[in-house]
């Protein structure tokens, strides 16, 4: 999904949906990849899950607060949603135990960033911060 409609020379045949309802109503797989913000907290909830076709699959690799766990568990129970794949979830590392009774709930311990490239970039950022701190007494990614 793109927030803005692309020009025909860039859309690669993609269909533009101007509402979440329009997009979700034709999505057999919903992959949540947006940032957490005031606008996206509980974006995937009881109402929006009803937009999906019966038997859809939902994945969340973004932030746990974007998905209402109780609504998603209810959708699993009713078989509105066939399966879920969660790399993130509300209250990490504590998982809503409601997911545990479903064989079609695949829960990962926040491994989405566990690629060699990402971990190398994280290590390099840490080194850069340490070097900057010892040179200037400050660092770019300071945590107080």
Residue ranges, per PLM feature:
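Rossmann-like dinucleotide/phosphate-binding beta-alpha-beta segment
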Residues: 1-54
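Rossmann-like dinucleotide-binding domain for NAD(H)/NADP(H)
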Residues: 55-144
